[in-house]
């Protein structure tokens, strides 16, 4: 984090030299930060999120894509002419650090994930799926709209594994496909299909007809 701040400071000096832009009146004058002494710069909190965002705006470089699972929350920040009226995002990770990012494909994915993760309907679905004896679950129209806005219509996962039958072995592929759909009456349905194939698409193999008990 300290290295990142030094790099940002260097870019500020470079901008001053090239564009003759005064950097003395930086937003740090209205910015207060609490530094956690151990480890240094592990946590940085700002009195005003707008100040935090606009300070980094002139030399804000996109970060490499990151997994949504690394983050615990986010905040949108509307800026002014100093940031060309852009909307910036403060992304809070699980170590207490904050990323200031412009809108990008991976940032939109993180926002989409975080905005739906804490919704009640999305927390109920895994519990319902693990208890098939519960039958149909009644959900409200609002819950169905939230689910429809955050669901992934189709997902496909592949898993390769080896079946060893003494002297012979074969490379197998397990494909898990799942579908989710919200109908016009706001009812929700799920479908799951599990298929086994041989890696070279052979028809009758241990992969499709294993003599195993799992």
From Swiss-Prot:
<comment type="function">
    <text>Plays a role in viral entry into host cells. Forms a pentameric complex at the surface of the viral envelope together with gH, gL, UL130 and UL131. This complex is required for entry in epithelial, endothelial and myeloid host cells. Mechanistically, engages host receptor(s) including neurophilin 2/NRP2 to mediate infection.</text>
</comment>
<keyword id="KW-0732">Signal</keyword>
<protein>
    <recommendedName>
        <fullName>Envelope glycoprotein UL130</fullName>
    </recommendedName>
</protein>
<keyword id="KW-0472">Membrane</keyword>
<dbReference type="GO" id="GO:0098670">
    <property type="term" value="P:entry receptor-mediated virion attachment to host cell"/>
</dbReference>
<keyword id="KW-1234">Viral attachment to host entry receptor</keyword>
<dbReference type="Pfam" id="PF11668">
    <property type="entry name" value="Gp_UL130"/>
</dbReference>
<dbReference type="GO" id="GO:0055036">
    <property type="term" value="C:virion membrane"/>
</dbReference>
<dbReference type="GO" id="GO:0046718">
    <property type="term" value="P:symbiont entry into host cell"/>
</dbReference>
<dbReference type="GO" id="GO:0019031">
    <property type="term" value="C:viral envelope"/>
</dbReference>
<dbReference type="InterPro" id="IPR021038">
    <property type="entry name" value="Herpes_UL130_cytomegalovirus"/>
</dbReference>
<feature type="signal peptide">
    <location>
        <begin position="1"/>
        <end position="25"/>
    </location>
</feature>
<keyword id="KW-0946">Virion</keyword>
<comment type="similarity">
    <text>Belongs to the HHV-5 UL130 protein family.</text>
</comment>
<keyword id="KW-0945">Host-virus interaction</keyword>
<keyword id="KW-1160">Virus entry into host cell</keyword>
<dbReference type="GO" id="GO:0016020">
    <property type="term" value="C:membrane"/>
</dbReference>
<keyword id="KW-1161">Viral attachment to host cell</keyword>
<comment type="subunit">
    <text>Forms the envelope pentamer complex (PC) composed of gH, gL, UL128, UL130, and UL131A. The pentamer interacts with host NRP2.</text>
</comment>
């Amino acid at each position: 984090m300290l290295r990142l701040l030094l790099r940002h400071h260097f870019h500020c000096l470079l901008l001053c030299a090239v564009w003759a832009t005064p950097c003395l009146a930086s937003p740090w004058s209205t910015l207060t930060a609490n530094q956690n002494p151990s480890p240094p710069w592990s946590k940085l909190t700002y009195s005003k999120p707008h100040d935090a965002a606009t300070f980094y705006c002139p030399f804000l470089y996109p970060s490499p894509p990151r997994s949504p699972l690394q983050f615990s929350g986010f905040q949108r920040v509307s800026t002014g002419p100093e940031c060309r009226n852009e909307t910036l995002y403060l992304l809070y990770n699980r170590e207490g650090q904050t990323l200031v990012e412009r809108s990008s494909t991976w940032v939109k994915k993180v926002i989409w994930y975080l905005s739906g993760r804490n919704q009640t309907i999305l927390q109920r679905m895994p519990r319902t799926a693990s208890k098939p004896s519960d039958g149909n679950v009644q959900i409200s129209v609002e819950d169905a709209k939230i689910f429809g806005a955050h669901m992934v219509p189709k997902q496909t996962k592949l898993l390769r594994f080896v079946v060893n039958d003494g002297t012979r072995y074969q490379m197998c592929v397990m494909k898990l496909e799942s579908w989710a759909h919200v109908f016009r009456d706001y009812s929700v349905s799920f479908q799951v299909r599990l298929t086994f194939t041989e890696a070279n698409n052979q028809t009758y193999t241990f992969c499709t007809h294993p003599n195993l008990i799992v």
